[in-house]
Curated annotation (Swiss-Prot):
Ca(2+) requirement for activity depends on pH. Active either under acidic conditions with micromolar levels of calcium (PIP2-dependent) or at neutral pH with millimolar levels of calcium (PIP2-independent). Residues 326-364, 654-681 form the PLD phosphodiesterase domain. One of its GO terms (biological process) is lipid catabolic process. This is Phospholipase D alpha 1. It comes from Ricinus communis.
């Protein structure tokens, strides 16, 4: 049967299955259970039935497990499914769970073409076996389905039409009004870095300084400092700009937190317990998070630091539980403090929160200059970070790995949502109940309340999103029936908050003109990958973001309208670039890009347009290259001969690591958080994440382009990356703009990768070194099989031994 495009939302209810066995007793089940017992040796088995929803081979929903209800399992569970798939059937699969996996009972098929008219289908569907014959008891499953095609959504392609936009629906946290947001590029910005960027109302863009603001927030807290991190390192200092000193600014983070705790401030920290850092695997952990050092530093002090493993929610199989605790992480990066009132009321306090991509750890402090060699005797002498070369050290010299990141400060009612997220996580994994009871402090700390009036031109509406499940957050509903009411999704016996993915999907679907993404990873929608050397259905990187982006571009090509997607990723994911895990991720990235370019090329041909697909979708990375200056730090030792390290040192170049997790849509809406564009971050039941989505109701892209803080922030980022500003940057969707940016990035790539170097690189934005063939295949750029100075393939390589769940 022909595959039909499903792009929109599917509402599905799975009610029950009737007569799963006939009058002859549950023979089928007895046999099944005996087989499982024999195979596994797990003792007497019980039936554990669950049902799944698949669009062809992509799993889009699953019910809870029902124990010992062999003949008439009744789930009565509803699902709200975003779809961007090709499918001929919606498939309902009934399975019996066991400790190692699951046994198929049968499948029921509802043809997609019956859904297209948007009418509700409510029916009993026959359950068939592998050969498409009815299972022997003539059993049926009762389901209800209704499909809402994306163009029927009144927000499709309309942007945020007014200040009455209610936010992303079906989420745990609703949108908050009257907030204030500060946007940060990098941990620090020196004075006078940003040129004049005009905003609406005759104003100019003013940058903020992240680690200075975090330092002030911690220093001035009087009641509580709550921190979560993938990594927190006590030895770093937050203040390092000699031109902007602060009283007490030379203190390390660890000493600052101890000092605040000794003053009576409640300091609580949840730091990911990197299980790989235990025992023989590796002394400093696969990812060197310093988790045990940090715990040790705060022992017997007033700071309560809890190492927090990524525990699975109850109900996974033995194998799944092992996967979650050893493969997945706590990735949220938040700081929550009490703070003075903006009006100077010295008695009352409010809550202020920070959310984004920056961990408070080593290797993160940087400025938009992203120097490789010139800060090695100052800001980075005691914070030399270079995990891409074995044995790299300050003694052997640069290049260090520069770090580009994005973060935010949230004030107003949204800040309390971040606090509530911390409280949920502490109650689940923090051990002792040490949380400050705000009710007892209500005469001091105000309740959640706006920090700006709705008619203030600088006010923000903000919504908090997460990827997290009941294994990491206390207070999620116990039953799947209650999950949708709380804006949550039910999984196989766990309740999941997957709202970060929902927020991205909604923002892409609303987009009118352009999308600008910076992210540490870009892979997913594996249901759309070519089966070249893999079985796409085995990969399970099913989040929709890449496919939603290409479907958005396709809709614009069909309508004859301009639309451009700009995506900035690192040259390679941090680590030894030749290693199997880095190469595997690059392979998934290539497959994702290729799926999108094939979609675009097909659409251009169908519409008779001859144009470079890179005018619609274009990928970049960041890099720097510096000539040697007199008076530069001279290392005492040299790297080993014939290594990537010595080659990069001699060529005076290295990538700038893009760690950001940000998307800007039409200069009116921004998402910033900890979540990467991969399955780990978007799944909800893998890495735990947090993000915010925000806009300024008085600066929407309705009648004319938006010129609020988000526009200023994007222009400031483009200035950082390109070393200049151009009039065309005001309209990123225009052919003039995308051609200009692509040309500059190609020029900078040529300078970066050339044999010789006469001047510093004039900008950091480099063309991602791939080609796009006439059918959309992603190819090597001529002469660029490997990244400069390495033997690491740009297009990556499939790993034969690392499971996809680890690298997607």
């Amino acid at each position: 049967m022909a595959q039909i495009s499903l792009h929109g939302t599917l509402h599905v209810t799975i009610y029950e299955v009737d007569k799963l066995h006939s009058g002859g007793g549950p023979h089928f089940f007895r046999k099944l259970v005996e087989n499982i017992e024999e195979t596994v040796g797990f003792g007497k088995g019980v039936s554990k039935l669950y049902a799944t929803i698949d669009l062809e081979k992509a799993r889009v929903g699953r019910t809870r497990i029902l124990e010992n209800e062999q003949s008439n399992p009744r789930w009565y569970e509803s699902f709200h499914v975003y779809c961007a798939h090709q499918a001929s059937n919606v498939i309902f699969t009934v399975k019996d769970d066991n400790p190692i996996g699951a046994t198929l009972i049968g499948r029921a098929y509802v043809p997609v073409e019956e859904l297209l008219d948007g009418e509700e289908i409510d029916r009993w569907v026959e359950i068939l076996d592998e050969d498409k014959n009815p299972v022997h008891s003539g059993s049926k499953i009762h389901v209800k389905l209704q499909y809402f095609e994306v163009t029927k959504d009144r927000n499709w392609g309309q942007g945020i039409r007014s200040s009455k936009y209610p936010g992303v629906p079906y989420t745990y946290f609703s949108q908050r009004q009257g907030c204030k947001v500060s946007l940060y590029q990098d941990a620090h910005i020196p004075d006078k870095f940003v040129p004049q960027i005009p905003l609406a109302g005759g104003n100019y863009y003013e940058p903020h300084r992240c680690w200075e603001d975090v330092f002030d927030a911690i220093t001035n807290a009087k009641h509580l400092i709550y921190i979560t991190g993938w990594s927190v390192y006590t030895e770093i200092s937050l203040i390092r700009d000699s031109r902007r000193p602060k009283p007490g600014g030379d203190i390390t983070l660890g000493e600052l937190l101890k000092k605040k705790a000794s003053e009576g401030v409640r300091v609580l920290m949840l730091v990911w317990d990197d299980r790989t850092s235990v025992g023989l695997l590796k002394k400093d952990g696969l990812m060197a998070t310093h988790d045990e050092e940090t715990e040790h530093f705060f022992q017997n002090t007033d700071v309560h630091c809890v190492l927090c493993p990524r525990n699975p929610d109850d109900g996974g199989s033995f194998v799944q539980d092992l996967q979650i605790s050893t493969m997945f992480t706590h990735h949220q990066k938040i700081v929550v403090v009490d703070s003075a009132m903006p009006n100077g009321d010295s008695q009352r306090r409010r809550i202020v929160s920070f959310v984004g991509g920056l961990d408070l750890c080593d290797g993160r402090y940087d400025s938009p200059f992203h120097s490789l060699f010139r800060t090695l005797d100052s800001a980075h002498h005691d914070d030399f970070h270079q995990p891409n070369f074995a044995g790299a050290s300050i003694e052997k010299g640069g290049p260090r790995e520069p770090w580009h990141d994005i973060h935010s400060r949230l004030e107003g009612p949204i800040a309390w949502d971040v606090l509530f997220n911390f409280e949920q996580r502490w109650r689940k994994q923090g051990g002792k109940d040490l949380l400050i009871q705000l009710r007892e402090l209500e005469d001091v700390i105000i309740p959640p309340s706006p920090v700006m009036y709705p008619d203030d031109f600088e006010a923000w509406n903000v919504q908090l999103f997460r990827s997290i499940d009941g294994g990491a957050a206390f207070g999620f509903p116990e039953t799947p029936e209650d999950a949708p009411e709380a804006g949550l999704v039910s999984g196989k016996d766990n309740i999941i908050d997957r709202s970060i993915q929902d927020a991205y999907i909604h923002a892409i679907r609303r987009a009118k003109n352009f999308i600008y993404i910076e992210n540490q990873y870009f892979l997913g929608s594996s249901f759309g990958w070519s089966p070249d050397g893999i079985k796409p259905e085995d990969i399970n990187a099913l989040h929709l973001i890449p496919k939603e982006l290409s479907l958005k571009i396709l809709s614009k090509i069909a309508a004859g309208e301009r639309f451009t997607v700009y995506i900035v990723v690192p040259m390679w994911p941090e680590g030894i670039p030749e290693s199997a895990s880095v190469q595997a991720i690059l392979d998934w990235q290539k497959r994702t890009m290729e799926m999108m370019y094939k979609d675009i090329v097909q659409a251009l041909k169908a519409n008779g347009i001859i144009e470079d697909p890179r005018n619609y979708l274009t990928f970049f990375c960041l890099g720097n290259r510096e000539v040697k200056k007199s008076g530069e730090y001279e290392p005492a030792e040299k790297p080993e001969p014939d290594t990537d390290y010595i080659r990069a040192q001699e060529a005076r170049r290295f990538m700038i690591y893009v760690h950001t997790k940000m998307m800007i849509v039409d200069d009116e809406y921004i998402i910033i958080g900890s979540a990467n564009i991969n399955q780990r971050s978007m799944d909800g039941a893998r890495d735990s994440e947090i993000a915010m989505g925000a806009y300024q109701p008085h600066h929407l892209s309705t009648r004319q382009p938006a010129r609020g803080q988000i526009h200023g922030f994007r222009m400031s980022l483009w200035y950082e990356h390109l070393g200049m500003l151009d009039e065309s940057f005001l309209n990123p969707e225009s052919e003039e703009c995308v051609r200009k940016v692509n040309q500059m990035a190609e020029k900078y790539w040529d300078l970066y990768s050339s044999e010789t170097l006469e001047h510093d690189l004039p900008g950091h934005l480099l063309r991602y070194p791939i080609g796009v063939a006439s059918e959309g295949d992603v190819t090597e750029l001529p002469g660029t099989e490997f990244f400069p100075d390495t033997k690491a393939r740009v297009l990556g390589a499939k790993s034969d031994y690392l499971p996809p769940i680890l690298t997607t």
